[in-house]
Amino acid sequence: MEVWIVANYELNLAHLYGNLLNTYGDNGNLLTLNYYAKQMGIDIHSEIVSIYQAFDPDKYDFVFIGGGQDYEQVIVSKDIQDKKEDLTKYIENDGVILSICGGYQLLGHYYIGANGEKIDGIGALDHYTLSQDNHRFIGDIEIHNEEFGETYYGFENHNGRTFLGEGERPLGTIVKGNGNNGEDQGEGVIYKNVYGSYFHGPILARNKTLAVRLLHTALKNKYGEEVDLPELP
C-alpha cells in the first residue's frame, strides 16, 4: 500500500523547453520525481520555461531538460543562448540539473547535427559531441558508479559521440552498452550538481537511487544539511 507523507518541504522545478524537447517519453522522469517526492514529504511545483521566456537562476531548485527531434533541437539551440548566462550562474551555484540526450549535448560546447552542421550549445560544461556516419548506439545499457556504489540501467538510442572535458566525470562506467562515445567506457556526465545522460527508460523510473539522490541534493541546497526525510521502502 502506498503511503503519502504530509509535505514538509517544497521544490520549484523548471522543465526547460518541455513543450519542444519531449520526444522520447523522458517526461516520465518528472512523474517519477513526483512519485518519490510525495513519499518523502516534498511538494514539487513545476513549470515549463520555453522559447522567449527568461530563466531565473534564483527561482528554481531543480531543472530538467530532455531531448527532441532535430528540428526542435535547432530551435532550442538558438533560444538557449539567451539563457546562457543565467543557466551558467545556476550551474556554478550548485543548482541541480538532470539533462537527457539533446539536453545533455546543449549544455556543452557544441554538437554535430544530422546534416553535419555544427550546432552551438551554451558551453556551461566542457564537453562536445560529434556524430557518426550511418550508425547509432542502440540497445540496453548498464553502468556502475563507483563513487556512489550504485548501478544504473537504461536504454540508449543516439547518434552522438560525446567527449567529456575539464572538471567533468562520467555518471558511470560501462558494464554493458556503448555510452558516451563507444571508446572511453564512460556514460553520461557529472559536473557539480549537473547530471547528464543518454539513458532513456526513463532513467529515473528505472533507477530509484538516482532519483532520490537528486531530490536529496536539491533539498540540501535549499534547506541546508538538516533535512529530515523518511526512509523509502
Question: What residue spans do the PLM features occupy?
Answer:
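N-terminal beta1-alpha1 cap of cysteine-dependent amidohydrolase-like domains
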Residues: 1-89, 205-206, 211-233
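Beta-strand-turn-beta hairpins that frame and shape the catalytic cleft
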Residues: 11, 148-152, 190-195
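Glycine-rich beta-alpha junction loops
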Residues: 17-19, 159-161, 201-203
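Conserved beta-strand scaffold positions in the cores of enzyme catalytic domains, especially
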Residues: 46-48, 124, 154-156, 194-196
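Structural motif
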Residues: 62-66, 98, 196-198
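Cysteine-nucleophile active-site neighborhood
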Residues: 70-145
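Pocket-forming structural segment of enzyme catalytic cores
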Residues: 114-187
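A glycine-centered loop/beta-turn motif at secondary-structure junctions
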Residues: 181-217
